Amino acid sequence: MKVTGYYVIVAALLALALRAGPSLAADDRNQDCGPATSDPRANLNGADKAHSAEHTQDFNCQDTPAEEGECYECVLPPEVRIEGAEVIDVADRNFYPRKTLLLARMIRHH
């Protein structure tokens, strides 16, 4: 009976995985080039794009130290303060846009 239950659970998990589609890990990142090539700002209207460009010359914030915080003003909600964020490792910057990773870490810690 236990063996049958095991197969039922495995089959259900497999069915859920197949219905969910591609893995979250299978994104459009090029492992050799660094951050994802897709630009989340593509869906912004003109005013939002201008506001975002005002705070960051480089969308991925590769050249701006995390301590300065200018890169994150358009991403973080007003109630979140930059002082509470973790410093991001250089290794992380090779694969992820810095501000996206920072936002994910802040949500996890607060």
From Swiss-Prot:
Entry's localization field: Periplasm
Region (Disordered): 27-64
Key word Signal present: yes
Compositional bias ranges of the Basic and acidic residues kind: 48-57
Keywords: Nodulation, Periplasm, Plasmid, Signal
Signal peptide stretch: 1-25
Recorded superkingdom: Bacteria
A single GO cellular-component term on record: periplasmic space
The protein's name: Nodulation protein NolE
Organism of derivation: Rhizobium leguminosarum bv. phaseoli
Gene: nolE
